[in-house]
């Protein structure tokens, strides 16, 4: 009886172990969209938000994803809808140069290989991502070259000079 109970417990452990391991996504099809901050006057950092809709040929759903941007890793959150994911990060305005940012997405297996390669100081570019999204950031607008206060003061001084000159010319 004890052997049967231990065999049942072993079978339960094996089944729970199999159910926790996620299946790899085969031939991912993505529909990406993204947003980047364009106005540096009203914000302190440049924000990048990438949203994707993911479908796999083998119909894997709700898989854990991780994103890598320029050597920094970020967790990818799942949306309420099936197959919707989002990742976001922020940079200082000076660090967020205009150009294209490559966001590489990894599943759990390839992400663990990426982290292992980083720990061992190996080349991480040889680890293929599940898919890649290119984010085009046009840069941030820092406001006009001359602030409106300085411009208003300069115009006021010019008007004062013209009025004073006209008064002096009339009295002469």
Swiss-Prot record:
It is found in: Endoplasmic reticulum membrane. It is a single-pass type I membrane protein. The chain crosses the membrane at residues 144-164. Residues 165-172 are cytoplasmic. Residues 1-24 form the signal peptide. Residues 25-143 are lumenal. Keywords: Disulfide bond, Endoplasmic reticulum, Isopeptide bond, Membrane, Signal, Transmembrane, Transmembrane helix, Ubl conjugation. The keyword Acetylation does not apply. The keyword Phosphoprotein does not apply. There is a cross-link at residue 72 (Glycyl lysine isopeptide (Lys-Gly) (interchain with G-Cter in ubiquitin)). GO terms for cellular component: endomembrane system; endoplasmic reticulum membrane. Disulfide bonds join 25-56. Its main location: endoplasmic reticulum. Belongs to the TRAP-delta family. Heterotetramer of TRAP-alpha, TRAP-beta, TRAP-delta and TRAP-gamma. TRAP proteins are part of a complex whose function is to bind calcium to the ER membrane and thereby regulate the retention of ER resident proteins. PANTHER family: TRANSLOCON-ASSOCIATED PROTEIN SUBUNIT DELTA, TRANSLOCON-ASSOCIATED PROTEIN, DELTA SUBUNIT. This is Translocon-associated protein subunit delta.
């Amino acid at each position: 009886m004890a052997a049967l109970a231990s065999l049942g417990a072993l079978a339960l452990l094996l089944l729970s172990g199999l159910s926790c391991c996620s299946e790899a996504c085969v031939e991912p099809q993505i529909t990406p969209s993204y947003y980047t901050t364009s106005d540096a006057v009203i914000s302190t950092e440049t924000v990048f938000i990438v949203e994707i809709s993911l479908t796999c040929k083998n119909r894997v759903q709700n898989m854990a994803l991780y994103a890598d941007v320029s050597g920094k890793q970020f967790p990818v959150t799942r949306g309420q809808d099936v197959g919707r994911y989002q990742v976001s990060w922020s940079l200082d305005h000076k660090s967020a140069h205009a150009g294209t940012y490559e966001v590489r997405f990894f599943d759990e297996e390839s992400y663990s290989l990426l982290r292992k390669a980083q720990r061992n100081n190996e080349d991480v570019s040889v680890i293929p991502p599940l898919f890649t999204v290119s984010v085009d950031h046009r840069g941030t607008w820092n406001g006009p070259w001359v602030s409106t206060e300085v411009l208003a003061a300069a115009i006021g001084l010019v008007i004062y000079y013209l009025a004073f000159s006209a008064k002096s010319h009339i009295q002469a």
